[in-house]
Amino acid sequence: MNAKIIIIGNEILNGFTKDLNAGFLIKTLIKYDVIVHNVVFIKDEIPFIIEELKQIKSIDFVFLTGGLGPTSDDVTSKALDIFFSQTKPKLLNNEIGTAPGLWYRKGKVNYFSFPGVPSEMKLMSKNLFSFFFDKKKKENTFFQVNTIGVPESKLSLLLHNFEK
C-alpha cells in the first residue's frame, strides 16, 4: 500500500509555522506497512489544491492536513467539494477541535482530510488508523547505529544484511 501526504497552509509556506504533521503521519503509516511516496506543501488556494488532487495516480491513500477551520483562508473543504462534485464525505469525529475530518473514496483511492492543528490531526489519525488498519499493523524493529568517520559506501556494505 502507498500514500501521498498533502500539507496545506500559507502559514507553513511563509515560514511562520513549522509543519509537525508530515513526520508524524509517515512514522505512523510505516507501522501499518503503508509507504509514503511523497509529501507536498501547497498554498491555501482552491486551484492549487484541486490541481494537486488531479495528479493522484497509482496511490492507495491521500492524507491532507490543514485548511478545514472556520477562517476565510481555510478552503480545503471547498476544494474537496469541487473536486468530488456530487460525492458527500463521511465525517471524521474531532474530539478536541471544532472542524471534523473528511473521508472520500474515488475509485480505489481513499482521501482523508484532517485539520492542520497537530494535536487534532494526531488524535483523529490514530483513531482512524486503529479502525482502518489495525488488523494489518506490523511491528518493526529499528536499530540506530552511530558512526564517526566511516564513509556511507563502506557502511552500506557492512549493514546490507540488516536491511532485509
Which stretches of residues belong to each language-model region?
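Non-catalytic beta/alpha edge segments that cap or flank active sites
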Residues: 1-164
